[in-house]
Amino acid sequence: MKYPLFDALEEISCLTNFVEIMSACGHSLPEFLEAAESFPLRYSIHSPTSDGNIAEPTEKIRKASLSVICESAEAADILGAETLVIHPGFCLEKDMFEKSYEALLLSISDLERMQDEFSVRFAVENLGSWDCCHFRYPDFVPILREAGLAFCLDVGHANLNSALDLFLDSKPEHVHLHDNHGVWDEHAALGSVDIDFSKVMKLDAVGIIECMEYEAVLKS
């Protein structure tokens, strides 16, 4: 995180009244909750992505990962955040992928129960094109719906899997907007590379510009 959370929010609040906070490093919640409470903004929260793995077959690690998400949900409730974005996890060992997927399904059930304890909506995000990633295609969306969880469409990730058109019919509640060449996860400015955003903009969903650099946000 390039800037302290307060400074980043002060700058961004001049552009929008809706901000998604990535809960990590110098923007971790609840550690820096006071900074977020200083602004009259609407929020969504992205739970930490490097502090756990809800698709981890080792039960202690899976449970610890859910505990981190629970802390994010508590902070989200304090802020009155509308959505908590959650990554579905990964598996680095091919021969363990099936067990990892089973662990993910257990976590989805746990998230269903956890969501009932809070007022924030839980949204699970589709991931990129690495073989280790779960939820690369829309066939996982019905599992989320059955559990009462929302779907966060990451447009850039969908493009990496040549699956954007397939995902558009899944009626996401939350959308991450960024561009790429379809090769790696660039998080480039909207319209600067390959993705046709005209179809995306027709979605009835909250859109979050998720570019890597502040200058790319301004270009978007």
Show the residue positions of the predicted features.
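Hydrophobic faces of well-ordered beta-strands that scaffold small-molecule active sites
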Residues: 1, 17-21, 43-47, 84-86, ...
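N-terminal pre-domain/capping segments
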Residues: 1-71, 150
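Active-site acidic/histidine proton-transfer and metal-coordination neighborhood
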Residues: 58-153
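A short acidic, helix-capping loop that chelates divalent metal ions and anchors anionic groups
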Residues: 51-57, 92-97, 182-187
